[in-house]
Amino acid sequence: AARKRLFKPIFGCEMYVAPRRLDQMEKEKDGRRYHLIVLAKNETGYHNLVKLVSKSWTDGFYVRPRTDRFELEAHREGLIICSACIAGEVTRKILSGDLEGAEEAVQWYKRVFGDNYYLELQRHEVKDPDQRANRETFPLQQRANARLIELARKYDVKLICTNDCHFVEQED
């Protein structure tokens, strides 16, 4: 049906990445995890995405299903990786003042995924007083975006503008 209508689906997942190995589960070291957008650009990528997601549930579950850098590298073929929201590794490290860690992460993802790695810029200015979380997020995004642009230029990583969307309809 998709081919008849010239509709090309893009399969992907916002995954959680363990700070160390997916089989390590110490609360102090492994309780936090990073967000990462993983998209399949072809059939091989789709199969690798399914492997990553499945293994995150069966072998990496600690509070949430998690993958790690080792699994990402092992199943990198056919995947597009995007740095995600302010809970992504690069952005979180920028916001915590760990600029060396942010640079290391960009270099690692660029080395492993090459031109299939993108840094995400997000700008969610929400003026609705009932939308507290987004209102608090905006200044953080602004601060991170400036540094993300610098990192993209320094390491020749493409930038994309995205939204942290999880629902189609606002009332959902």
Predicted regions and their residues:
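Phosphodiester-processing cores and adjacent nucleic acid-binding clamps
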Residues: 1-172
